[in-house]
Amino acid sequence: MKLTFLGAGAWGTALASHAAATNDVVLWGRDPAQLGAIAATHENAAYLPGVKLSARLAVQADFELAVAHAADDPDGIVVVATPVAGLREMTRRLAARSARPVSMLWLCKGFEAGTHLLPHQMVRAELDAAGRTEGFAYGVLSGPSFAREVAQGLPCALTVAGTEPSLADRAQAAFHHHAMRIYGSDDLTGVEVGGAVKNVLAIATGASDGLGLGLNARAALVTRGLAEMTRLGLALGGRVETFMGLAGVGDLILTATGDLSRNRKVGQQLASGQSLEQVLAGLGHVAEGVRCAQAVAELAATHGIEMPIARAVCAVLFDGLSAADAVAQLLQRDARDE
């Protein structure tokens, strides 16, 4: 199968390298020099230093040629591996092509700043505006996965949710091999809400661990955080079983407890007394939990949903509340039934 990956960050590169073992894969990025280095060394030194990539992975600096590689193949898939903020641009560029409709998957997790739209709602809006909804199949690939481990060939399991069963089938054919398992779903909303909210909750568990509050506190935050994720997801149209699966509790556990998690690191460093500006400056890469914390808090308020952990994270990030005071406020909440 022909696959094109748009975005040469850690996750796009890792998944492209995995897919290249059994597929014809092209990787596109905005920096031609970076792509040249990947081709020459089989390493993405900027995002996955020290990890050897598949020698079968090809790179292409020309956007149109890269897209045509997969889009002109009836079974091909274009995989958008940008953050949420770049998804609209990629969709517009794909919709602007005069050629046949594209099958596309995205890897980003979060809500759009300002609109609070989920990724599939953003994509649908762009396709509607371009008059290109006919024939376009699209969906999301999500679940518990650190890019470095995927690039190293370590086992993982992911969920694909799309607008058409055929897209999920093709995604399974492309990625379900070696150490990776792919499970299908038709709950686009649930899969995307799980991927967005878990990043916010991971900041909370990172802060708790940074304050030295122990494993009991971490388990409580993960469990009660899952309840918050589920409440919001159901209000937005997701299904409860999705939040009990890989895209929900699975991704939450990994991101909240794994030391490769950028969002967890944000919480740990905030707990140490660093400002948000200092934390982000030192991080070097995107932490989507920071970007979507405000959206989660505002969506909860709009729908009348109780999400005290997510609200506390938002207050620490943007309102000057210290991590220690946020924990104190959570502990002072009235007793209630689970």
Curated annotation (Swiss-Prot):
Pathway: Membrane lipid metabolism; glycerophospholipid metabolism. Catalyzes the reduction of the glycolytic intermediate dihydroxyacetone phosphate (DHAP) to sn-glycerol 3-phosphate (G3P), the key precursor for phospholipid synthesis. GO terms for cellular component: cytosol. Keywords: Cytoplasm, Lipid biosynthesis, Lipid metabolism, NAD, NADP, Nucleotide-binding, Oxidoreductase, Phospholipid biosynthesis, Phospholipid metabolism. It holds the Pfam family NAD_Gly3P_dh_C. Its EC number is 1.1.1.94. This is Glycerol-3-phosphate dehydrogenase [NAD(P)+]. SUPFAM superfamilies: 6-phosphogluconate dehydrogenase C-terminal domain-like, NAD(P)-binding Rossmann-fold domains. NADPH binds at residues 11, 30, 109, 147, 262, 286, 288. Belongs to the NAD-dependent glycerol-3-phosphate dehydrogenase family. GO terms for molecular function: glycerol-3-phosphate dehydrogenase [NAD(P)+] activity; NAD binding. It catalyses: sn-glycerol 3-phosphate + NAD(+) = dihydroxyacetone phosphate + NADH + H(+); sn-glycerol 3-phosphate + NADP(+) = dihydroxyacetone phosphate + NADPH + H(+). The keyword Lipid biosynthesis applies. The keyword Nucleotide-binding applies. Sn-glycerol 3-phosphate binds at residues 109, 143, 145, 198, 251, 261-263. The active site is at residue 198. The gene is gpsA. InterPro entries: 6-PGluconate_DH-like_C_sf, 6PGD_dom2, G3P_DH_NAD-dep, G3P_DH_NAD-dep_C, G3P_DH_NAD-dep_N, NAD(P)-bd_dom_sf.
